[in-house]
């Protein structure tokens, strides 16, 4: 803390704020400086050394500090440190007098036939700190070496150079990042470096970074990178308690288990028992637990102790995805065997596979134990390919500047999904083909999900038939508010859990509300989301069609025509039913599959010859649908259509755009908004249950020729031509002049031949009736 007058200023020094590392070229004037001492250095690097965790952590922190001031995120620092470790240790030999040595020079006594540096201290204007002047010598003893990590030149632009830059005429893309001699790096330290890196990077990110480095530097450097990558993930021997302090492994794995514990949505006796047993195994049998937790995905262990009922509950509460197969002794990843059954978990949940093995007391037989590869000194020297800078430079195409910098970027904010619960729970699904938009509305969904039974004491076992071998519907509940139906499936091999089949309409919030209502009435302890949408029915209206009959009278893409007034087409192996007035139904699909079906069907509809859209009316009706997230009722649509038609006749066709702007303004301000819970336009039992059967049957009707007729007799989506045709043919028109003007306007403005012919027939009927 620094005092300034009466004020106190707290100065905190960041561990990444400054660095003691320096940069030095490894290739000068066509000379590879590392070639002569590489074998001796590799022998030194691979020998066994005492492991002091505090020293190792100090070294890796200094490697982190070399990232530079522009790198502000720890993940980016970790990636640069990882790349330096993957390129591995390197040494640059030199000769200097004793009075010129410093903390970066370590003693060495090997004779070098090739080039070495002769250095001496000098002050130069190119640097604010003392640097070395140098010259190249051959066939001379190297008195000292600079030791550090191989790096790329662009990573070290911010680091001070050991040599005077005035004398550096040219240099390679590779440089060495050297550290003080008390921070020497040995291969024994590599696995401990990984433990530090894993604080900021996942294993997948480490592998991805390794692949990116190999693809950048080319195949000639790949072998060097791969051997150091293997060193990160492998100990030379099983860790001894004398070498590795017990708290190191204990704290490391405990920290990871605490992270998993925090990801569990709900904690109860099942999750508590699971993690308590795992913690106990790690505490009491550390070596056994570490071996089990590090088990490869290729291993398929067999366990002897297993409880299926408890296992099913663990899968639900820990959200583990498991596939059950027969054990056919085939190659299978991420699995384990119990009896004749193979249980396979998802690749992203391999840690849970190993934790389950630990929970169920899995022990690897001696004859099946995997022999850990021992990284011997001779093996390391034989495998690692010394980096020949003359050859490796050719891996980069000429004229292409290599770029492997980590640019510090602000983390992107993850956008929330537009539809709560995902696209499968969307009330409206829209697709576009050119200027035509098709909106599909969900009429009902059927979903499956798992639940656990809370009161086993109230469950009567003898009610389940002894001969039952499959699940069946034990209970069925129908609710009015919110309107939904739940079927409960119970199986005789599982008395703790049940499967629910829910039939409901509405958004995801209504679904969650329905689950809460259901839980209040039955003995359910927990419901497990997400639910799986197994069936979904949707309805569509083609808006703005001048002649709606052409959709059902088409000849192409027709799959089946039923006796019922419905034409069946097929799109993406889904049957789409088309009724009168351009109304269609799409069963079974939801989400992306529904979008694909809509696009295919809309494309088929656009290919119908003689199909004409009134695009202004189409835009208005689509906007009203999207505003209310519901199909437009018959009365609302007719009010909008004939109001617009009257305005067009009053203003004249020349001011059509003015009328369109007026209608857009009225729709945007909610003049045509309607109640979505209207039962007059639905046949869904859930909706009828809201108001009761008698009131639900009270659909608005009109009297035509002394006969009651439902308003949607012509179809909910009927256009003006269909309504006028019905009125003219029924003869229930008192003021024929109004209808003649409407029909004449339609004939004048329509571009569809079928529409003009139909209007001409209707006008002929009206004029004939007027004469008679």
UniProtKB/Swiss-Prot annotation:
Taxonomic superkingdom: Viruses
Family per similarity comment: Belongs to the herpesviridae UL87 family.
InterPro entries for the chain: Herpes_UL87_C, Herpes_UL87_N
Name recorded for this polypeptide: Protein U58
Source organism of the structure: Human herpesvirus 6B (strain Z29) (HHV-6 variant B)
